[in-house]
């Protein structure tokens, strides 16, 4: 990622209204809950020691994101639209500049941002994640869609086993992409009608899926969160 030059655009600092969220009256309580009273400060060098330290950390991350958004993602956006993705051996391949965007956000450490530090994440509150998402969306709403689907990992963190967490969360924090596989031909917003069935294969130690998913955003992702019966 290039060193920020004087007068370069920044989609965070150029839009001070985004920072308003950091001044919300409930923000201090939100940070305390997310940081569990700052217990990580004894284990991780980059963990905040108090509320003010956490806010400064968030501002730095937002500033880095604003720099990447304005000076890499936005300049790539027209090329991404013109080239578009394509099929290759049955696999959807991103436009070349989308790969550049992914490389930039990976190098900036902007993946798995809401996950705990022990898995390689930044332990950011959802408020800050939403601010990052807004900054990236200002540069390219299409790439924001790809990037923000990392939030699917929150479901696994909340409901998955520790074995699953150890297996998948570090991969997302390292920049692997995700998708949320919900929609079917006869089940869109009415998810009670989902028919795809998951059956555990004890011999192979894996789940077998029988059914159809359709219109899956970022459906070529590395990791899929699948809703099944």
Mark where each language-model region is.
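Internal maturation/activation junctions in enzymes
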Residues: 148-149, 160-207
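Short coil/turn segments at secondary-structure boundaries
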Residues: 33-38, 76-86, 115-117, 144-149, ...
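A short core secondary-structure module
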Residues: 206, 210-229
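Extended, charge-enriched "interface" segments that sit outside catalytic cores
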Residues: 4-88, 92
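Conserved, non-catalytic sequence blocks in retroelement Pol enzymes and Pol-derived host proteins
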Residues: 90-93, 120-121, 186-189
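Internal helix-loop-helix
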Residues: 66-67, 96-174, 217-219
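Short, surface-exposed charged micro-motifs
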Residues: 102, 195-199, 215
